[in-house]
Amino acid sequence: HNLLYTLLCISFFADQEIDETEKEVIFNSYNKFIDGVTDQSFNIDFGMTTTKFIDLKSESARQAYYDYSLLAIKEDKEFKHKDLVKVINAYVDIANADDFIHEKEVTLIQHAINIWDLKLNINKPKSGKKLEIER
């Protein structure tokens, strides 16, 4: 559930909530990378991942587990370079879902880019603009 944990972090760390639009984007993103996801299996996985997030209690523990999850994804043979770029796109989609880009979202996404050694960059856009990947 490392992928789902990172998707959840992008959404939750910024404003301490996950609205329905963000949850739908998380589902669609997760579904692209994990075969056979149903609404029911997603809700089970999402519940377990949310519980893990809550159980970690502190932001520093949650951040440490985010780092751990990013490294686990990087080392997973299932994820090739192009897949990691697609995951970054999924993070950007989540950040854009609620029409407000939080600094924390930008920081978390840039952190993933750095850990995965991708030649990408993102910058917090001007008010009212969408977050975009710069190559």
For the regions a protein language model found, what residue spans apply to each?
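Small-residue-enriched hydrophobic alpha-helices in membranes
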Residues: 1-135
